[in-house]
Amino acid sequence: VTRVFPEFSNLRVYAGGGGSVPFAPGAPAGPMRFVDLLTHMSGLTYGLQNRTNIDAVYREHNFDFARRHLDSDAFVAKLAALPLEFQPGTRWNYSVATDVLGIAVERISGQRLGDYFAEHIFGPLGMVDTAFGTTEANHAR
């Protein structure tokens, strides 16, 4: 994934710390692959899981809903600055990997995700009422 996300070139795995204690620099993470993102085996997490110190930092930064207040580049940069919960490809954990995959589509295509889906998926399938949100004109429906 580092060709699309150079920010992920120097990821590290959690080794301790959190809360009032700084994170201990962990081992360098192995390469994260797109299949790891697709199968929730990337080492990323969700804050809502409330299990680990990494989850707590995700909650602190509101990562579960970060796309409402961070642009794609800022979101990826903040994720890249945090340690992973585990080495990519070694464990399974629901995570913001789906958000990262959406950003990959944006970076590769040069389009916003909703525009890409409308042009390449929804439009060709005749799904004219399908989108990531509603327009003001459709609120009354």
PLM-predicted stretches and their roles:
Residues 3-141:
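Short, surface-exposed loop or secondary-structure junction motifs
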